[in-house]
A protein has these predicted regions:
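Short, low-complexity disordered leader/linker segments with a strong preference
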Residues: 1-26
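N-terminal secretory/targeting leader peptides
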Residues: 18-114, 123, 131-325
């Protein structure tokens, strides 16, 4: 029912947009992050570049903070062409494009340089377009850093400390299996509902990157952050193929060029925001721990090993990524 209501609202927005400006083409972009998040700022930057590149002929209209629905709902709206663009985690996209689940596997990348080489190289670009058969055209990867655990009642020093804890995860089978492999009880909850879930004790903690932990104000509830960096799942900027196929080659170039500019800008912003977030949460009284990551890597290593017999194709993809120099 909510999806129908959102679709109806989007149709009204479209009608209003057409009346206000019958010369410029407007594409609606919705996402679930707050306006202070570096990824939102990068999308605003991209919108400015699109308008500049097109001389005002093409515009992006941004709806942040889950105004038009959850990540999953936004993807479904893209599939029917009721929404133009969205930003989602690759973990959510894996429900539509299964190979993207590779990014959710633990300790896949050696470092940030390795990660960006994969995103920007042949492997990453192939995966980016893998959702086209589901009417989802990937434009670029936005950096989402490394995911770590944060909790309410006690710190996490080693995997054993997670046992029995209810940890919020994304709607992703891979994320669920990873947290389960470390002994915790994975609990899928939408991002917009997580603050309340933490407050009310529905979950004992969650896992995410530092900037998201800070901008969501989860530090007000969770006073322990463990930098174990178990996975590095990028965000993906996606456009509906229904909308994409209706654009001229010139309009596609305006968008692609702006997306690439925004990617460079976003990575710079992300690096700065990680440092700012760390300082801010420590000032707010959060205890930050740097555990021996090898303990978490060893405990979760069975996930990749099991692929050799359970999913040879995905195992080969993991090997390809690990071999990128």
């Amino acid at each position: 029912m909510r999806l129908y209501f959102i679709t109806f609202c989007l149709l009204l927005i479209t009608l209003v947009s057409c009346k206000e400006n019958n010369t410029a083409k407007t594409i609606k972009l919705a996402h679930g992050l707050g306006v202070s998040h570096p990824v939102h700022k990068a999308m605003v930057y991209m919108a400015d570049r699109v308008e500049e590149n097109s001389g005002g002929k093409l515009k992006l209209e941004i709806y942040p903070s889950s105004q038009l629905g959850s990540e999953r709902q936004c993807l479904e709206l893209l599939q029917i062409g009721s929404l133009g663009m969205t930003k989602v985690s690759a973990a959510v996209m894996e429900n539509f494009s299964p190979d993207l689940r590779v990014f959710g596997y633990p300790y896949l990348f050696r470092n940030n340089e390795h990660r960006f080489k994969v995103y920007d190289g042949e492997i990453g670009q192939k995966l980016l377009l893998d959702g086209e058969k589901f009417w989802l055209h990937g434009l670029t990867y936005f950096d989402a850093g490394n995911r770590s655990f944060y909790t309410k009642n006690h710190p996490i020093h080693k995997p054993e400390d997670l046992k029995g804890l209810k940890i919020r995860v994304m709607q992703s089978p891979t994320a669920i299996n990873l947290v389960k492999s470390l002994g915790a009880a994975p609990t899928p909850i939408s991002w917009g509902e997580l603050y309340t879930a933490l407050q009310q004790g529905v979950v004992d903690g969650a896992e995410n990157n530092l900037p998201s932990f800070y901008t969501s104000k989860h530090y007000e509830v969770c006073k322990y952050f463990t930098v174990n960096e178990h996975s590095s799942v990028p965000d993906i900027l996606v456009i509906s193929t229904i909308i994409w196929n209706d654009l001229s080659s010139e309009e596609k170039k305006w968008i692609n060029d702006a997306a690439q500019d925004a990617t460079v800008y976003q990575r710079k912003l992300w690096h700065e925001s990680e440092e700012e977030a760390l300082q801010a949460i420590e000032k707010a009284g959060v205890e930050v721990y740097y555990p021996d990551k090898s303990l978490f890597e060893k405990e979760s290593s069975g996930m990749i090993k099991s692929l050799k017999t359970e999913d040879k194709e995905l195992y080969d993809l993991v090997q390809e990524i690990e071999n990128v120099k």
